[in-house]
Amino acid sequence: VQPGTYNVDIYFNQSLSKRQDISFILDSSSGKVKPIIRLALLEELGVDIQRLKKDGVIPTNANPSQIVDLMALIKGATLEFEVTRLALEISVPQIYVKRQVHGYVDPSLWDQGLTAFYTDYQANFSRNDSNGNRSDYRYLGLRSGFNIAGWRLRNESAWTGGTGSKSTFRSNRNYAEHDLSSLKSKFAIGELYSQGEIFDSVRFRGAQINSDIGMLPDNEIGYAPVVRGIAETNATVEVRQNGYVIYSTSVPPGAFEIADIYPSGSSGDLTIKIIEADGLVREYSQAYSYLPVMTRQGNFRYSLAAGEYAYDGQPSPRFIQGTVVYGLSNNLTTYGGGLTAQDYKAANVGFGVNSGIGGFSFDVTNSQSKGLQGNTDEGQSARFLYSKTFNATDTSFTMSGYRYSTAGYRTFSQHIDDLTYFNEQSSGRQKSRLDMNINQSLGQRGSMYASLGESSYWNRQGRTRNWQFGYSGTLAYASYSLAIAHTEGSGGPNSDTQFTASLSIPLGRSDRSHRLYANALASQHGDSSVQSGVSGFLNEGSTLSYSVQTGHSKQSGNSSGIGLGWDTPTSRINGNYNQSRDNKHMDLSAGGSVVVHQDGITFGQPLGETFALIEVPDVSGAGVDSSASIRTDRKGYAVVPYVQPYRYNWINLDTTTLGNNTEVSESSAMLVPTRGAIVKARYASVQGRRVQFDLKQDSGQPIPFGAQARDSQGKVLGIVDNLSRLLVFGIHDQGVLELNWSSGSCKAEYHLTPVKRDRAYERFELRCRTSSAQ
C-alpha cells in the first residue's frame, strides 16, 4: 500500500467494528508503510484504556490523541491491513477488552441506502353467502415510499368496501422523516402520530423530533404486542389503530395469533374486530405499548411535537407537546412532560424503578380543559405499569398496568370530543383500566399464557372486559393446544365465551411432512363445531402449501373446505373456500411489493419498514439462505424484506441455486441500514463453463503434477493435479491451452460440445502437443 489516507473497514477481534479514514505513513526505521493508530481509536473499538493505565502499559496521563505502536504496546496484539478489501484487522487479547454492549453497532457503519421508490400492498377479498344472502368484504392496504439523500417520504393508505357499505379510500398519513444520528434521534414532518410513552398518542399535522430507540443497544429496546383471539368460523380479523385499519387477514376456525402487525404510530390501543362468516362481529381492544418507563443511568430520551390535531370531522387546535425520560441511576428513572393547546393543558410527572421484584413505573397526569359551554374541568389520572420475568419459575409479566382517572380528567383526544359533541360525552370517558399479560414456560411440558383487560367508565353501568387463557404442548411428535377467550361489553348483549382445543400430528419426520390436525370449538351461545383435516407442502422448497378439511357444526351442519397458499418470488397468495349447509365462504389474499431503483423495477414479497435489494449481475433464480421463495429476476435482482435497522444483517446467497456455470467471489454480504433505508448488496459473479480436461501428452504419458495452464491470452486457468486432470471455469467454447512445467511444455486445441446444464461439470479428454524445454 502507498502512503496516504484510505477509508477502511476496521475489524476488531474479527468483528467489523467501524468504517473511517485511516492515514498510512512510511516508517523510516522499518521501511514499511504503517497505519496511524491513536489511543482514542482503540478506546472507541473497545480496548480497556483504564486497564492499560492500571497495569502500567501506558501512562496515567496519556493523551487520547497519542499515536501508539500497537504490537509493541500490548503483548499478543496484532495489526494487519488487507489492501484488496481495504480492511484493517486489529486483534487485542481479551484481558484488555471492555465488555461490549450486545447489539451495539458503530454509527460509522450505518448505511442510508439507495435513492428508490417502492410500494407495498396487501389485498384481501372475502365473500359470505348465508342462506342466499351474499356479503362481500374488500380491502387494499398500501404503504409507499421514496428515499432520497437520507430522507424517507412515506404514504399509508387503505381502500375498504363491502356489501352494505360505501367503498372508501383513505390516506392515513403522508410524512417525511430523516434520522439525526448524532442525537440518536429522528425528525419528521407531515401527518404524524405523537409519541405515546407518557401522553396518549394523537394524530396531527406538524413536525416532531424524538429519540429513536432503535439506535440504542438491544437491552434498551421494548417490544410490541401479540394479538390473540378465537374465531368460530372462517373469519376476517381487522386491526385498527387510532381509527385507521392497519392490518386485515383471514383466519380459520379456532385460536389465532398475529405477531407481524405493522403499527401506524408509536402508541394508541389496538382495536381488534373479528368478522365471522355468518355476519357475527366481536370487537375488543388491546394495549399496544404497556411497558414500564425506564432507562439506564445517564440515558436521555425526549420528544418534541408541534402542529394541529388532525382527525376527520373534528376541530384542529394547534398544540405543543414535549416529554423527557432520564436515567438517574440503573435502578431509578425520572420522566415527565407537558402538552399545551387552546383551552387545554396537561402536565405529567413520574418515576420508574428497577427492583428485585420487577420493573415498575408510576406517574400522575393533571389536565385542565374548557368545554363548549365555557365550563372548565380539571382532573388527574394515575398510571402504574409493571413488567417482570421470574427466572426461577420462567414466568413473565409483560405489558401489565393499571390506570385510574378522576371525573374531571381529559386526555387531549377527549377534550377534542368535548368540543365536537355539545352534550360532552362524559359517559364514554374511561374511569379505570386494568391490563395484565402473563406467559409461563413449562419446559418440555409446553407453555401457558393468560391476559386480562378490564375498563370502567364514568356515568355508565357495568364494565367492558376481555380475558384469554391458553396452553400448548407436545406429546412425542404431536402438538396440541387449549384456549378459552371471553369478551364482555358494559351491559351489552355481545358478551361471549369461547373454548377451543386443537391437535396436530405429523405424518412423517421431516420439516415438510404433511400434518393431520383436528380442532374443536364451543361457545357460550350454544354453538359447537368439530373440524379435522390434513395440511402440508406440495413442493421441495415448501413454498406451495395446501389444507383440506371437513367438519360438523351444531348450527351449520356438515362442512368442508380447501385452502392453497403460494409464496412466489414476487408475492404471497392465499385462497380458501369453505361450504356448510347454510353458508359458503371464500377468501383470497395477495401481498407483494414493487421497487423502482436506478437499474430498473424489481417485484418482491411484502416488505418491512427496512429492506434490502440484492444483485447477482445477470444471474436469474439465485436464492438466499433465509427464504426458499426469494429468487433473483432475469436481471439478477431480488428484494429481501424485514432487515433490522442499526444492526448487522448478514445476507447469504444459497450457492446451490446459482447453477453450475456461475461463481461468486463472496457469497455473504453484511448490511447495516438506517431506519427505512433500502440498502443494496452486490455479489460479483462470473459466468462460464466448468470443464475438466483429462490430459495426456502425444506419447500417451500424463502431464506432470503441478503444470500450469494458461489460455492463448496468457491468463492462468489452473494447475494440473496428480492424475493429469485440469479443472477450469469460465473458458470459451473453443481455444488453445498452453501447459508449462519444469522440463517441458505443450499446447492443446479444444472444441467443446454444447453445454449440458444437468451436470456439475463437463469432462473432456485432450491430447497435448509436446515440445522440449529450451
What are these regions (language model features)?
Residues 121, 142-146, 173-178, 322-326, ...:
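Residues on the lipid-exposed face of transmembrane beta-strands in outer-membrane beta-barrel proteins
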Residues 1-221, 524-595:
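Post-signal-peptide, soluble extracytosolic/periplasmic N-terminal scaffold domains
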Residues 10, 229, 612-617, 689-698:
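A short, amphipathic beta-strand motif
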Residues 115, 134-140, 168-172, 223, ...:
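Residues that define the transmembrane beta-barrel architecture of outer-membrane proteins
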Residues 166, 191-203, 363-432, 482-502, ...:
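Outer-membrane beta-barrel translocator/channel fold
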Residues 3-11, 15-24, 618-627, 699-713:
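Short, ordered, surface-exposed loop/turn motifs in non-cytosolic proteins
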Residues 113-131, 148-163, 187-191, 301-310, ...:
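Transmembrane beta-strand segments that form the barrel wall of outer-membrane beta-barrel proteins
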